[in-house]
């Protein structure tokens, strides 16, 4: 009995079916997770947000060496910006690298003209510039700008002092580095409905990145980090846990999809389809899914358009028409209505 009670702590807790992707680009993603137990929206949302912001690795320029320049307070002949301004502009360059090893990238430009991040060359092609339009310097007629930069992988924010090592040449200038590929993370917790209950959480998570990592991957990596960090707190053998696949019917038989207990009114059907189901006295999804396509098409005013609408909505919930629900026991309130 003690073990059964222990497993009930998490086995009986409601869990989200899947993550709904509302928007997905290389730079922005919006994800909805529901239903969650009350309080878990803010618990999970806050934890994921903090991990996404602080713990994902990215690439950044950590030092620069400019021809004929000894320190950051210098100027370069024929270049509008001084070295301090050039360094500030280099901090804005966003990179993507395919290796964890330090890499060297270069600029060799001649005026007149504007130097942008797109002028950066990666000798071995392992470093990709994500914002090639980013401004670096302005050169006048006859001016040249030759720079060699070091790219490293890290996480969070590193001050210039931390990017300096004993073997750094005197004319190499370490710079502050923002490694995080994340621009911004936001989450909102709202209400989610399961059957007639509305006291569940819905977590909406928005992630903005610099393009070096996809938003959906950022969320997945953060979830993996959180999972790995939490494993140490589990003080029992998980392999001994009895299998728990879902909700059983009242007789203790096979497991059935939770959505079967929902009302057809929750499907947000068109007025025509909704009226057809009402006329056919179909109130719950378990009644609907037992009907075949041919049976539904015999319903008055029910056509192909309504059929396709219902099939699509059922498929989203893992259901379909013509299902065999042998052993399924309807909710007690439905039995009472039929008496």
Curated annotation (Swiss-Prot):
Pfam families: RNA_pol_A_bac, RNA_pol_A_CTD, RNA_pol_L. Residues 1-237 are annotated as: Alpha N-terminal domain (alpha-NTD). It is an enzyme of class 2 (transferase). The keyword NAD does not apply. One of its GO terms (molecular function) is protein dimerization activity. Its EC number is 2.7.7.6. The keyword Amino-acid biosynthesis does not apply. One of its GO terms (cellular component) is cytoplasm. Gene3D superfamilies: 5' to 3' exonuclease, C-terminal subdomain, DNA-directed RNA polymerase, insert domain, RNA polymerase, RBP11-like subunit. SMART domains: RPOLD (SM00662). It catalyses: RNA(n) + a ribonucleoside 5'-triphosphate = RNA(n+1) + diphosphate. Residues 256-339 are annotated as: Alpha C-terminal domain (alpha-CTD). Coiled coil: none annotated. One of its GO terms (biological process) is DNA-templated transcription. Keywords: DNA-directed RNA polymerase, Nucleotidyltransferase, Transcription, Transferase. InterPro entries: DNA-dir_RNA_pol_insert, DNA-dir_RNA_pol_RpoA/D/Rpb3, DNA-dir_RpoA, RBP11-like, RNAP_asu_C, RNApol_insert_sf. Belongs to the RNA polymerase alpha chain family. Homodimer. The RNAP catalytic core consists of 2 alpha, 1 beta, 1 beta' and 1 omega subunit. When a sigma factor is associated with the core the holoenzyme is formed, which can initiate transcription. HAMAP family: RNApol_bact_RpoA. The N-terminal domain is essential for RNAP assembly and basal transcription, whereas the C-terminal domain is involved in interaction with transcriptional regulators and with upstream promoter elements. DNA-dependent RNA polymerase catalyzes the transcription of DNA into RNA using the four ribonucleoside triphosphates as substrates. This is DNA-directed RNA polymerase subunit alpha. The gene is rpoA.
């Amino acid at each position: 009995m003690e073990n059964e009670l222990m497993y009930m702590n998490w086995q009986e807790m409601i869990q989200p079916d899947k993550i709904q992707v509302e928007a997905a680009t290389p730079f922005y993603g919006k994800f909805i997770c529901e239903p969650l137990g009350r309080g878990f929206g803010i618990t999970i949302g806050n934890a994921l947000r903090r991990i996404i912001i602080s713990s994902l690795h990215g690439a950044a320029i950590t030092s620069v060496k400019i021809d004929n320049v000894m320190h950051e307070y210098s100027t370069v002949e024929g270049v509008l910006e001084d070295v301090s301004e050039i360094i500030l502009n280099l901090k804005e360059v966003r990179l993507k690298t395919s290796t964890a090893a330090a890499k060297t990238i270069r600029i060799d430009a001649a005026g007149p003209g504007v130097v942008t991040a797109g002028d950066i060359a990666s000798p071995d092609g392992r470093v990709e510039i994500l914002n090639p339009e980013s401004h670096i310097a302005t050169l006048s007629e006859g001016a040249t700008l030759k720079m060699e930069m070091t790219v490293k992988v890290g996480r969070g924010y590193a001050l210039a002092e931390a990017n300096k090592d004993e073997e750094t040449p005197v004319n190499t200038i370490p710079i502050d580095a923002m490694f995080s590929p994340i621009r911004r993370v936001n989450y909102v917790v709202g209400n989610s409905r399961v059957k007639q209950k509305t006291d569940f959480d819905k977590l909406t998570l928005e992630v903005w990145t610099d393009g070096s990592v996809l938003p959906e991957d950022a969320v997945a990596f953060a979830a993996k980090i959180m999972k790995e960090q939490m494993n140490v707190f589990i003080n029992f053998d998980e392999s001994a846990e009895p299998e728990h696949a879902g909700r059983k019917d009242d007789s203790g038989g096979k497991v059935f999809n939770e959505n079967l207990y929902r009302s057809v009114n929750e499907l947000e059907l068109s007025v025509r389809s909704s009226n057809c189901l009402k006329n056919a006295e179909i109130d719950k999804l378990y009644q609907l899914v037992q009907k075949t396509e041919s049976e539904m098409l015999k319903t008055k005013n029910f056509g192909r358009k309504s059929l396709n609408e219902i099939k699509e909505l059922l498929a989203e919930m893992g259901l379909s028409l013509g299902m065999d629900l042998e052993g399924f026991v309807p909710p007690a309130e439905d039995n009472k209505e039929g008496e």
